[in-house]
A protein has these predicted regions:
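Conserved catalytic cores of phosphodiester-cleaving nucleases, focusing on short active-site segments
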Residues: 19, 39-54, 58, 65, ...
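Acidic-basic catalytic patches of nuclease active cores, encompassing PD-(D/E)XK
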Residues: 1-38
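A short, conserved structural fragment
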Residues: 208-219
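Short, cationic-aromatic polyanion-contact patches
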Residues: 218-242
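Long, charge-dense
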Residues: 70-115
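Long, low-complexity, charged/polar intrinsically disordered regions in eukaryotic proteins
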Residues: 96-167
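Short acidic, hydrophobic short linear motifs in intrinsically disordered regions
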Residues: 180-192
Length: 243
């Protein structure tokens, strides 16, 4: 039986707390204990986890909950619009400007690289929440020398402007560009998507780990990759504990 906790968002950062409030519906259980883990939102049998940080931190938790038969939906905020807010060490506003950085759903692979074996599980769903956020920087002397003492103090949710739901192999493979040749190299993927070779490598590593991409020889020293028929059987027995 799930056990609700009385402690709410006191220890949470603003972004996580705001997203949880945005997602919560009447009847949901918040910060409920289930199978030894604290669940952000429990909606009937559905577990909803808000993950604003590194996915490696939730790898074991996801494996245990999915292995116990629970449907899990992970909500990951991606800031497609971001404003930089600079404050004094005491929190007084210095200035605010819009960041020119453009973020895209493919960047989620920076996190998915930690959980490729989780993705094919039939009870797993990933939702990328396209958000507008403020990034709060404070001149408190606590940041690194690279930041000249400025610290990244917090993230604030301004709005959720869209979402991308990834449930099936087809959903994840659809993040590959339509004009990608078959087979293809990491460099070709990076060039067409206009991303770094490092991110392209994370994409192919993750999709291979999920069983949706296979090596198809070499082109010179570069490995060639080809999508696997998503309707072919994917064995979950290779990862019995999903850890």
């Amino acid at each position: 039986m799930p056990k609700p906790r009385l402690i709410g968002t006191l220890s949470e950062k603003s972004l996580h707390a705001a997203l949880k409030a945005y997602l919560t519906q009447p009847g949901d259980l918040i910060e409920t204990s289930l199978d030894g883990y604290v669940i952000d939102i429990l909606r009937g049998e559905q577990i909803i986890e808000v993950q604003t940080g590194n996915f490696s931190a939730m790898k074991r938790k996801l494996g245990k909950l999915l292995g116990a038969g629970h449907p899990v939906r992970v909500m990951y905020p991606l800031p497609v619009g971001k404003w930089i807010v600079r404050q004094t060490g005491s929190g007084e506003l210095i200035g605010r400007r819009k960041s020119p950085t453009q973020r895209r759903p493919v960047e989620v692979f920076r996190q998915l690289v930690y959980i490729p074996h989780i993705l094919p599980h039939p009870n797993f769903t990933l939702e990328i929440l396209l958000t507008h956020q403020e990034e709060i920087w404070r001149d408190d002397g606590l940041g690194s020398w690279r930041r000249k003492g400025w610290s990244l103090y917090d993230h604030r949710l301004l709005d959720v402007v869209g979402q991308v739901t990834l449930t099936s192999a087809e959903d994840f493979l659809a993040l590959l560009p339509e004009n990608l040749p078959t087979p293809f190299t990491n460099r070709q993927l990076a060039t067409i998507l206009k991303i770094t070779p490092g991110l392209a490598g994370k994409m192919t590593y993750t999709l291979r780990g999920a069983g949706w991409l296979a090596e198809a020889g070499k082109k010179g020293k570069a490995i060639l990759f080809s999508p696997v028929n998503p309707h072919s059987s994917i064995s979950l027995d290779a990862h019995p504990a999903l850890e």
